[in-house]
Amino acid sequence: MLKRLSPFLILLVFTIPGAFADVYIDNEYKYIENDGTLHIVGEIINESNKPINQVEVNAVFYHDGNAVYHTSTENLTSIIMPEMKGAFDLTVIEYIGDIDHYTLDVSFKIAQPKEQVIEITSSEFTQGPVDNISIQGTVANNGEITANMVKVIATLYDRDGNVVAISQTNTKPDYLRANDESFFVIPIMDKTQADVIVDYSLLAESEEYTAVPEFPLGSGVLLVASLSAYIALTKNPSMITRGLGYLSNPKWILSRLR
């Protein structure tokens, strides 16, 4: 009996730790809102070759070497496909006293794959009347059946690529028929973080489907450039006037073509 089980046990020893090593928390960041709510935001990387679900982030907070508070949160999408990322926003509303440091770990289960057919087809930053920032865009269902409970999650980054906030929304209505497209708006509610945001990435999923693979790296560079220009122009509108003046000047255009 032992001889029959030993190959299985050896396989178990080498495969399960490997799966856990390929799923990890990355790029986490802690901040406190104006109302005192503590946030820890970050990404969950799945570098394994299997989809995972029931992904949970567990946090332990310490003071003077003693654990003083435990809490947990779930990944904001129901599944993370191989070579894809998840996002989490762990919040602590109550006062937990002075904290020296915290630790995070992640737990998950191997899942059945979902079709990757929910696609973000367009997106852009917008600025509201009271200087609040939002992301608006369109999401498409490239599947063969209706997608229900469609949601879009935004991971927001600073200039150095660090995660600084997470936000999400459901489409309205929250279903999307096959080969149809819907509009979405993701508000960036925390103004303390809005000042440092220069880039974002988006994930979308439904109960039936998950997101198509992310944009290639080059698209991210374009997003950074676009947002930097957006911020510069909103802070210095005269740049627009000068730019339009140059474009309406034939001599200036010809000098740039030589």
Predicted regions and their residues:
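Terminal connector regions
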Residues: 92-132, 163-169, 185, 189-211
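Secretory targeting signatures
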Residues: 1-22, 42, 209-258
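Hydrophobic beta-strand segments
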Residues: 56-59, 73-76, 151-154, 169
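Short, solvent-exposed loop/turn segments enriched in Ser/Thr/Gly
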Residues: 35-41, 130-136
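Asparagine-centered strand-capping/turn motif at beta-strand->loop junctions
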Residues: 44-49, 139-143
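Short acidic/proline- and small/hydrophobic-mixed sequence motifs that coincide with surface turns
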Residues: 50-54, 68-69, 99, 146-149, ...
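Short beta-strand and strand-turn-strand segments in soluble, beta-rich domains
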Residues: 22-24, 54, 64-74, 116-118, ...
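Intrinsically disordered, low-complexity Pro/Gly/Ser/Thr-rich segments with frequent PxxP/GP/PP motifs
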Residues: 67-96, 164-192
